[in-house]
Regions:
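...captures the hydrophobic TM-helix bundle architecture rather than a specific catalytic motif
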Residues: 1-218
Length: 218
């Protein structure tokens, strides 16, 4: 009888294998940080490959980077920094039970993320039209050298993988909007929104490293 009463007193968001909400929160946060570390390791390998190739052929990397549109890259940097602000405001709004404001901030984050992807689409299509493709598909006459093709292979791999993470982040944020509308997140339970925010901040930070490494080679 006592156990049944205790079960009824548990909040609906508390999973059965946790003692209380605090334990669930700490476990979820720890798990999220472990996941983020694996993401950093994955991108870290690509950064190492970039550094090695650039150290071997600095002049060619410099010339190849000139084919990238710095203005579009800078615009996307501003867009993602703004999205970091809106997702942070969304988390704070949920903590204060300002659910409508949180939904608006999350929607703004999705719009900014979509803007990032649209800009990246135009950037990619411009490269494709010139024959600047990864690997064996590289046919651009402006820089006729194998290492230029390697630079763009790294460029597409790093920015493409980052773009996939942006799309995943958009999906997660939309899911959080749905949960917020259903009342599933609030001041007493905002772990999913906070973890989504952590993922989104990582996506932003990775781009902040990618932008100078790829677009601002000197």
């Amino acid at each position: 009888m006592g156990n049944q009463i205790a079960e009824k007193e548990k909040p609906s968001h508390l999973q059965h294998h946790f003692v209380d909400s605090d334990q669930q929160f700490e476990s979820s946060k720890f798990g999220m940080w472990i996941f983020l570390v694996t993401e950093i390791l994955m991108f870290g390998g690509l950064f190492v490959a970039y550094i090695i190739y650039r150290s071997w052929h600095p002049d060619l990397f410099y010339l190849a980077a000139k084919e990238l549109d710095t203005a579009l890259g800078a615009t996307n940097t501003v867009v993602l920094i703004a999205s970091s602000l809106t997702i942070a405001l969304a988390i704070r709004a949920v903590q204060l039970d300002k659910i409508k404001a949180a939904i608006n901030y999350m929607a703004a984050t999705v719009v900014l993320a979509g803007t990032f992807m649209v800009i990246k689409y135009f950037e990619y299509t411009d490269k494709f039209a010139k024959g600047i493709l990864p690997g064996a598909g590289y046919t651009y006459d402006g820089i006729a050298h194998d290492m230029a093709a390697n630079f763009f292979s790294i460029y597409y791999m790093m920015t493409g993988l980052h773009g996939i993470h942006v799309v995943i982040g958009m999906g997660l944020i939309i899911w959080m909007i749905v949960k917020a509308k259903k009342g599933a997140v609030h001041s007493g339970y905002y772990t999913p929104v906070e973890n989504t925010g952590l993922f989104w901040h990582l996506v932003d930070i990775i781009w902040i490293f990618l932008f100078p490494l790829l677009y601002l080679i000197d």
